[in-house]
Amino acid sequence: MLFLKKNKTRQHTKVNWKIKHNCLDLIIESAKSIYPNEFGALLRVDDQQKSIISEIILLPGTVQGETHTIFKLHMMPIDFNIVGTIHSHPSPFPIPSDADLELFRKHGRVHIIIANPYNHSSWKAYDYNGEEIKIEIV
């Protein structure tokens, strides 16, 4: 019997992502509090409105250093409302590294990078291909 490897291609579906203001504030304060280390967490959407990011989930065992955040993804809860990741950069550039892009491709549909000085204008969002996307604050 011959088994062929299934070609993993994602269908690009347009989602108008939104993030709750208080969730973004929590991300900002979390990034500030752990500086100069990187902050990292998972993004979770509302149960009823699947395009609104409403909270973050801290993974047990996450390693946060000055140049990296290592997620222990085997500790991720079984939760279909987890849609991506958030992590901070101690530099002023919210641009994904090669390691970030690898994570984006493997886990989640939307990802946020917040950069120093950690405020409402120092973050960017990306899809799983590393393409910048817009997220509305609600």
Description of each model-found segment:
Residues 1-82, 91-138:
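Conserved beta-strand-loop surface patch within small alpha/beta domains used
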